[in-house]
């Protein structure tokens, strides 16, 4: 079996994300792959490459980068039209064509041609999926940080945890990415003294998922916001984290630590644990 060729990596490698739409798909896939390498990357986005003139302009930019860097740029491309893709393929770059790699084999397997519609997943602003996402975002904003107890029956998931444990960004990610209606409520010292969940949540315990965090990391985050305060003191953070975890265990609430997890990993865990199945996007 052949072995990978070992090269002396340069300090920074240029990466182009080329698309005839927004470039979100190319960028998301590219990021997932690039994180597997302990190298620095300079990222260049080239969205809306939907005419030959724009494709030749992208070709010029890639070749200029090759001349300046002395090494091939890496290209992640989602150009649907073959004529545009063939232009970019003439560049002095290492070309990763996601359409050819995945769509064409699927056409053969499924026995049907794809629609080859440019930017399809990001332009269906009138679709039911888009409306659901907007509704979910509005719901999550209205139910952020315990602002409202109204209409909790409509929530898909209710996140609880100490302040600054990642509840708000996770709620908004679930809403924006999956159309999940996520409310979130802070667990505070008053709740620990009463040994009860925040008012109104008991009836929806089956929807609750908890987020915890390492006390030292929590202290770091809180000190960025309120340096030197009791709120950010390590001793207080330890108390809140310990009490919150004790409450979640007592109430039988599923929970996880967000300390070393990305928002994407947290969201994926929640979807799996709560048994939520986000719809396949158009």
Swiss-Prot record:
Pfam families: Kinase-PPPase. It catalyses: [pyruvate, water dikinase] + ADP = [pyruvate, water dikinase]-phosphate + AMP + H(+); [pyruvate, water dikinase]-phosphate + phosphate + H(+) = [pyruvate, water dikinase] + diphosphate. Its EC number is 2.7.11.33, 2.7.4.28. InterPro entries: Kinase-pyrophosphorylase, PSRP. Bifunctional serine/threonine kinase and phosphorylase involved in the regulation of the phosphoenolpyruvate synthase (PEPS) by catalyzing its phosphorylation/dephosphorylation. Belongs to the pyruvate, phosphate/water dikinase regulatory protein family. PSRP subfamily. This is Putative phosphoenolpyruvate synthase regulatory protein.
